[in-house]
């Protein structure tokens, strides 16, 4: 099986693995790697099937987490954005002894709306899957525009994300479809109750994909975790507010000693 693309930079004594979201790749972290590299040893990863980690089709969440773990350092802080948040959470559930802390960014344990749970309407996710088969580049671009809508720098932020996608090979339609299937079906709400490691959750108030209404619901469900809401950010707070985004990560590093 192909190795996944993995780059290690920085000289901090704390290892930080960064997992990107659906349709993207590790280039999305370019706006924060300079700030973080002097504090952490950063592990930048293209998830299987994305960016430079070609040769993978659709995978289950468990298989994706296992594949990433195989190349990971023995111990690290794991940070996952959006779909990457589910992968990082799955890693923490499978091997908590290898995770010093879990950080999820604009991520939900259950992306699909159901009953009284706020999220993306299942028919919207199914629509994206349908559109992928028709014109997947345009579908990915629409998804990127949705991620930055509402922020003062929306156009510029969408450009940064689009640049990250277009600078590398496009993911295969199978990998993209597999990622949407994970977003549509996975529900880790109960599985993450009582997670035995520090857990930090970061959100954007203007996020159109992960509604801020889930924040108090998860505060109640996971009382040991900590949540931070960036007031003027949407789905990609590290792109729109890089300096503010890095602050809680540096505080977490201090807390871990």
UniProtKB/Swiss-Prot annotation:
Keywords: Biotin biosynthesis, Cytoplasm, Hydrolase, Serine esterase. Its EC number is 3.1.1.85. Residues 15-241 form the AB hydrolase-1 domain. Gene3D superfamilies: alpha/beta hydrolase. One of its GO terms (cellular component) is cytoplasm. GO terms for biological process: biotin biosynthetic process. SUPFAM superfamilies: alpha/beta-Hydrolases. One of its GO terms (molecular function) is pimelyl-[acyl-carrier protein] methyl ester esterase activity. Substrate binds at residues 22, 82-83, 143-147, 235. It catalyses: 6-carboxyhexanoyl-[ACP] methyl ester + H2O = 6-carboxyhexanoyl-[ACP] + methanol + H(+). Pathway: Cofactor biosynthesis; biotin biosynthesis. It comes from the Bacteria. It is an enzyme of class 3 (hydrolase). Its main location: cytoplasm. It is found in: Cytoplasm. The active site is at residues 82, 207, 235. Belongs to the AB hydrolase superfamily. Carboxylesterase BioH family. The physiological role of BioH is to remove the methyl group introduced by BioC when the pimeloyl moiety is complete. It allows to synthesize pimeloyl-ACP via the fatty acid synthetic pathway through the hydrolysis of the ester bonds of pimeloyl-ACP esters. Monomer. This is Pimeloyl-[acyl-carrier protein] methyl ester esterase. It comes from Klebsiella pneumoniae (strain 342).
């Amino acid at each position: 099986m192909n190795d996944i693309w993995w780059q290690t930079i920085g000289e901090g004594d704390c290892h930080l693995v960064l997992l990107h979201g659906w349709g993207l790749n590790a280039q999305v972290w370019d706006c924060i790697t300079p700030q973080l590299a002097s504090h952490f040893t950063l592990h930048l990863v293209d998830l299987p099937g994305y960016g430079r980690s070609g040769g993978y089709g659709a995978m289950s969440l468990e298989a994706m987490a296992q594949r990433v773990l195989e190349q990971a350092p023995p111990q690290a802080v794991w940070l996952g954005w959006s779909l990457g948040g589910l992968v990082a959470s799955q890693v923490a559930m499978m091997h908590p002894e290898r995770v010093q802390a879990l950080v999820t960014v604009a991520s939900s344990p259950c992306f699909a709306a159901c009953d009284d749970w706020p999220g993306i309407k299942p028919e919207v996710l199914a629509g994206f899957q349908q559109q992928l088969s028709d014109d997947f580049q345009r579908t990915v671009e629409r998804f990127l525009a949705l991620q930055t809508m509402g922020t003062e720098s929306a156009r510029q932020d969408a450009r940064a994300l689009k640049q990250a996608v277009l600078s590398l090979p496009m993911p295969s339609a199978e990998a993209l479809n597999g990622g949407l299937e994970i977003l549509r079906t996975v529900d880790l709400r109960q599985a993450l109750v009582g997670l035995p490691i520090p857990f930090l959750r970061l959100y954007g108030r203007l996020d159109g994909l992960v509604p801020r209404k889930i924040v108090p619901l998860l505060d109640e469900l996971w009382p040991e975790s900590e949540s931070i809401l960036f007031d003027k950010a949407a789905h990609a707070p590290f792109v729109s507010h890089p300096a503010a985004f890095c602050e809680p990560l540096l505080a977490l590093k201090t807390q871990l000693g």
